[in-house]
Design a protein with these regions (language model features):
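Intrinsic disorder/low-complexity segments
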Residues: 1-20
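N-terminal Rossmann-like or analogous alpha/beta NTP/dinucleotide-binding catalytic cores
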Residues: 22-150, 302
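Short helix-capping/linker segments at secondary-structure and domain boundaries
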Residues: 53, 118-122, 154-161, 260-268, ...
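Short, polar/flexible loop-turn hinges at active-site or ligand-entry regions and domain interfaces
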Residues: 69-70, 160-163, 242
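A generic secondary-structure signal for well-formed alpha-helical elements
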Residues: 81, 88, 116-119, 157, ...
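Short catalytic-loop micro-motif centered on adjacent basic/acidic residues
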Residues: 95-98, 161, 239
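Internal, conserved structured core segments that host functional sites
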Residues: 131-180, 184
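Conserved nucleotide- and phosphate/pyrophosphate-binding catalytic cores
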Residues: 168, 174-340
Length: 340
């Protein structure tokens, strides 16, 4: 998230949106979707479309600080749009768009940078953390929080969902908004962070946090044979088949609990504690439940892929709505600072 479908509905829909709070979520255009980032980020983000006017920004400008392969970036942008739409983002209820389809945001970032105190941004946790991980120190990386502030302010965002590690970005955004308001008059509303509740870490097949970089992921839209192979390779202990097993320490049980009903979870827990069932059988049960749970999303994804213009149409409609909002805000900004 900014971590972070489609405005331009009916006339009634647009009037209705005016009275709703605006929620902005930023989405990093990263790689293949797996179970960990679905439950950790995607599902809670999509749920926001029922709470207000939800905007979902695919942060391709931000991605340029780390991605140097243009073909990979283009593919990732389309993939993340496809996956969000397949997993339930509704373009009749929310607005999905590419960052770069609203170029005014870079103009606002420059204007904000002219009042941004150097000391404030030198203390940015994310900048220090990325340098510590070996990311090259570039001006773009240093200015990342200014662009993020522009992302938030240009849409008159009321709420920005973030993890605890990104709360500082919202505080910096508010600081810049206050600075601009004190200098040039009331231009910006002050966005409020919504600190996302800590989601339980989704374990990978080796028991560590599921991550593509660890090679322990189970992909949602992968091949059935490969998905089964991944599930069947989940690391387990050496407890004999007949002996009771501890569900609390089982990757199998933790993953099953994400997709099964309360009754199904209770039944598996009982079988773990009773003994008499081997891990292999539990893995088979887990695979079947995972495959069943994501089946509607796989079908929806195939439908979208069958319509070659659908993603482009959705992103174009989203860009139109996002630009309508951004144009109104930038008109205020330019007049306030003397550019018009």
């Amino acid at each position: 998230m900014l971590i972070e479908s489609f405005g331009i509905h009916s006339t009634f829909g647009i009037r209705h949106l005016v009275s709703l709070m605006r929620i902005l979520s930023g989405i990093q255009p990263s790689g293949v979707l797996h179970i960990g980032n679905y439950f950790g980020m995607m599902r809670p983000a999509i749920a926001l479309q029922t709470e207000g006017e939800a905007l979902y920004l695919i942060a391709d400008y931000h991605a340029l600080t780390s991605v140097r392969d243009p073909e990979a970036l283009r593919a990732n942008i389309r993939r993340v749009a496809l996956d969000f739409l397949a997993c339930g983002l509704d373009p009749e209820r929310a607005t999905l768009f590419r960052h770069s389809d609203v170029p005014q945001v870079t103009e606002l970032a420059w204007i904000l940078s002219t009042v941004a105190p150097m000391g404030l941004f030198e203390r940015a946790h994310s900048y220090k953390d990325k340098l510590a991980r070996g990311v090259a120190a570039t001006v773009g990386l240093f200015n990342y929080p200014v662009l993020m502030a522009a992302d938030i302010l240009i849409y008159d965002s009321d709420i920005v969902p973030v993890g605890k590690d990104q709360k500082q970005h919202i505080e910096m955004t508010r600081d810049l908004a206050v600075k601009m308001n004190e200098t040039f008059g009331q231009i910006f509303k002050l966005p409020e962070p919504r600190i996302q509740p800590a989601t339980e870490t989704v374990p990978g097949i080796d028991g560590q946090k599921m991550s593509k970089s660890y090679g322990n992921n189970i992909d949602i839209f992968g091949d059935e044979k490969e998905a089964r192979k991944r599930v069947m390779s989940i690391v387990t202990d050496s407890t004999p088949v007949d002996a009771p097993k501890d569900p609390a320490n089982s990757t199998i049980f933790k993953l099953y609990s994400l997709v099964a009903s309360k009754n199904e979870i209770a039944e598996m827990r009982e079988r773990f504690l009773k003994g008499g069932t081997g891990y292999g059988d539990f893995k088979k049960q887990l695979f079947e439940k995972l495959w069943e749970y994501f089946a509607p999303m796989r079908r929806r994804r195939e439908e979208i892929l069958g319509d070659k213009s659908y993603i482009d149409d959705v992103l174009a409609r989203g860009a139109q709505r996002a630009n309508e909002i951004a144009d109104r805000v930038m008109k205020r900004v330019r007049e306030a600072v003397g550019l018009r």
